[in-house]
Curated annotation (Swiss-Prot):
[4Fe-4S] cluster binds at residues 200, 203, 206, 267. Transmembrane segments: none annotated. Iron-sulfur protein (IP) subunit of succinate dehydrogenase (SDH) that is involved in complex II of the mitochondrial electron transport chain and is responsible for transferring electrons from succinate to ubiquinone (coenzyme Q). One of its GO terms (cellular component) is respiratory chain complex II (succinate dehydrogenase). The gene is sdhb-1. It catalyses: a quinone + succinate = fumarate + a quinol. Pathway: Carbohydrate metabolism; tricarboxylic acid cycle; fumarate from succinate (eukaryal route): step 1/1. Residues 190-220 form the 4Fe-4S ferredoxin-type domain. One of its GO terms (biological process) is aerobic respiration. Its EC number is 1.3.5.1. This is Succinate dehydrogenase [ubiquinone] iron-sulfur subunit, mitochondrial. Component of complex II composed of four subunits: a flavoprotein (FP), an iron-sulfur protein (IP), and a cytochrome b composed of a large and a small subunit. [2Fe-2S] cluster binds at residues 107, 112, 115, 127. It comes from Caenorhabditis elegans. InterPro entries: 2Fe-2S_ferredoxin-like_sf, 2Fe-2S_ferredoxin-type, 2Fe2S_fd_BS, 4Fe4S_Fe-S-bd, 4Fe4S_Fe_S_CS, Beta-grasp_dom_sf, Helical_ferredxn, SDH/FRD_Iron-Sulfur.
Length: 298
């Protein structure tokens, strides 16, 4: 997994260099740093002309600059000329003020999880987080906490996705199954057990708000991955619940959760990862067991 990630990063670097060469962009780190807008340039482009000017303080980090250190840069945005969400402000700043501002985004509807970041001290999605209309206070925007930063508001998600892959998030059967031959039956009650679990969009807001995950990310799976693990353990169509639980039966994978509840408080989809982790602990300790699958009528 790590070797594959290294190859992907190397390929991405080669692709980036090719794009720079084709577009005439600066190829060296020093040239790249020099091409970034200065504070004076930003101030000139964000001249306060409206009545509802909002200041955004945004975390900046350029890994291509020699000896780069994180900084916080201020941008003024006229709310009368901007959409209502934080992502609207970020896009406006990138399009009209500073094209070097870097962040992830995709669906703009709270479905993909790409634009997860820390806004005003709370992990959330920029696309569904409304701009505070109080112009007397600035809004602070940082990347997800306790993650390596790729650039600006872009965190490195490699470890998070590697942990997700480790739980084998797909249905596994012990009996031969030919796709299309028959349906994998679920009763209404069995399907209802997945509600509040399958809706997770893997944005990592919960995991990166968890102190246990901050200090033990190499061993503790974290709220998001554990909730996904429970989703597959409890699925009536899956035959490998025992094996899935066995892989988590140690002192760190699940039991490092101290029920701090930050995960449930911050989830932008209003899910309850802490409850799912509690259910996993009950299964691991033998207090509860997975309900037997109902007989199939198919």
């Amino acid at each position: 997994m790590l070797a594959r990630s290294a190859r992907l990063l190397h390929s991405a670097e080669l692709a980036a260099n090719a794009i720079r060469a084709a577009s005439g962009a600066p190829a060296t780190a020093a040239a790249a740093e020099a091409s970034f807008p200065s504070t004076d340039d930003v101030a000139a482009k964000t001249k306060k002309t409206g009545n509802r000017i909002k200041t955004f303080e945004i975390y900046r980090f350029n890994p291509e600059a020699p000896g780069a250190k994180p900084t916080v840069q201020k941008f003024d945005v006229d709310l009368d000329q901007c959409g209502t969400m934080i992502l609207d402000a970020l896009i406006k700043i990138k399009n009209e003020v500073d094209p070097t501002l870097t962040f992830r985004r995709s669906c703009r509807e709270g479905i993909c999880g790409s634009c997860a970041m820390n806004i005003g001290g709370q992990n959330t999605l920029a696309c569904i987080c409304k701009i505070d209309s109080d112009t007397s206070k600035s809004t602070k925007i940082y990347p997800l906490p306790h993650m390596f930063v790729v650039k600006d508001l872009v965190p490195d998600m490699n470890l998070f996705y590697a942990q997700y892959a480790s739980i084998q998030p797909w249905i596994q059967k012990k009996t031969p199954l030919t796709l299309g031959e028959k349906q994998m039956h679920q009763s209404v009650a069995e399907r209802d057990r997945l509600d509040g679990l399958y809706e997770c969009i893997l944005c990592a807001c919960c995991s990166t708000s968890c102190p246990s995950y901050w200090w033990n990310a190499d061993k503790y799976l974290g709220p998001a991955v554990l909730m996904q693990a429970y989703r597959w353990v409890i699925d009536s169509r899956d035959d490998y619940a025992t094996e899935r639980l066995h892989r988590m039966h140690d002192s760190f994978s699940a039991f490092k959760c101290h029920t701090i509840m930050n995960c449930t408080k911050t989830c932008p989809k209003h899910l309850n990862p802490a409850k799912a982790i509690g259910e996993i602990k009950s299964l691991l300790t033998g207090f509860t067991s997975k309900p037997a699958a109902e007989p199939s009528a198919f």
